[in-house]
């Protein structure tokens, strides 16, 4: 039995989502695709991540944010769904911070991965 699910995220920026997925080592495609849902239906997604079992997962724009679309019974990623969403959120936030600090004239000086899995990010700006 299929357990097709749409999971709400806080992801709003397509480019940052692409960077986060790439950081996680996932291969994605942004052409418009349909994800098979159950036996006889499909769901259009904006970003497709192929899985070996042909039950692919994707992200679909829903008015103001992206939703993850997947059949949870056929989830075939190296992490559980919860760990995947945590890692994706962390990478998305990282790229969001980098992008925003660049807009304000900062550059990344250092990043340190902490024992608890968090990332300590140090940015700097030179005043002339």
UniProtKB/Swiss-Prot annotation:
Superkingdom in the source lineage: Eukaryota
Transmembrane segment boundaries: none
Record-linked Pfam families: DUF1257
Main location: plastid
Subcellular localization: Plastid, Chloroplast
CC annotations in GO: chloroplast
Family the entry assigns: Belongs to the ycf35 family.
Name of the molecule in the record: Uncharacterized protein ycf35
Species of the source: Porphyra purpurea (Red seaweed)
């Amino acid at each position: 039995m299929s357990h097709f699910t749409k999971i709400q995220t806080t992801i709003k920026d397509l480019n940052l989502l692409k960077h986060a997925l790439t950081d996680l080592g996932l291969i994605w495609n942004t052409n418009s695709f349909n994800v098979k849902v159950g036996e006889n239906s499909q769901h259009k997604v904006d970003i497709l991540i192929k899985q070996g079992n042909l039950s692919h997962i994707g992200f679909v724009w829903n008015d103001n944010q992206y939703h993850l679309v997947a059949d949870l019974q056929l989830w075939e990623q190296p992490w559980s769904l919860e760990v995947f969403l945590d890692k994706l959120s962390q990478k998305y936030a990282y790229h969001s911070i980098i992008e925003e600090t660049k807009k304000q004239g900062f550059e990344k000086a250092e990043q340190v991965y902490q024992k608890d899995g968090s990332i300590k990010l140090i940015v700097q700006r030179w005043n002339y």
